[in-house]
Amino acid sequence: KKSNDLYQRASLFNITLSLPELFQVSTELDILDTNVSKGIKTLTIKGNDRIKATLFLGKTNLFETIIISNLEVLSNLSKSKTAPAMRAINLDRMVYFLDQKVGPYPFNKIVISDEDTKNNPVYGLNQLPGFLSPFPTGFEYDITQFKTLSRTYLENTLLLHPRKDAWLFGALQIYLMIEYVNTYYPKMKVLGSLSKFWIIRWSHIADLEFNDQYSLLYLNMARNNIHQPL
């Protein structure tokens, strides 16, 4: 099983990668040099004080690069209806928010991958059918991107055991998501515009705000005795 929970101290990575010329490499490490000879491309890659080294290989470059202040953000999340300029503005807001809450990101690049999003989705939003959009334009993409970005941000900066301390990563991420929604989407309902439908608005769930879902999910786990003991 691909557990992705290798635990190691921050290390210096020196990687020499040789692959067919047609392949593209995307990584949050520094690509120092690229040489092409007889159809073979050789890259020299380096990362200092890194907890992990992640490389994405493909015949086409699917990553969108956005420069935010001194940080280069690489993202291949599925595009939404949000315009590229608005995605850049939202991403700048996310990075600023994380800088204020967690501290400045210590590296030059960070990757937000679709694979990480699928492994750690925003439950509820990812289950909505494509024709149903109860939230404001860009909200779903913004929250999905923030969850993946904040998780990567934490995993790359906190030297915690990915398996034993998984609960701490999760707790910090939930805290950040609650604060982010409170700051930029106050009064957002858990059902979005569906809470105004006559068949729903009479029920208690229509009054619940987006962040109320976390306490409700915890109470459900506690009631079923499946919550993690401290």
What are these regions (language model features)?
Residues 1-54:
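Extended, low-hydrophobicity, Ser/Thr/Pro/Gly-biased non-transmembrane segments
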Residues 2-5, 80-85, 163, 225-230:
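Active-site rim elements
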Residues 15, 40, 44, 62-165, ...:
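Juxtacatalytic substrate-recognition/specificity segment
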Residues 22, 52, 101-105, 201, ...:
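Short secondary-structure junctions and interdomain/linker hinges
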Residues 24-28, 104-110, 161-163, 183-193:
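Acidic/polar loop patches that form or flank catalytic/metal-binding clefts of enzymes
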Residues 35-37, 118-120, 197-201:
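Amphipathic alpha-helical surface "interface" segments used
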Residues 164-230:
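Acidic/His/Gly-enriched intrinsically disordered linker/tail segments
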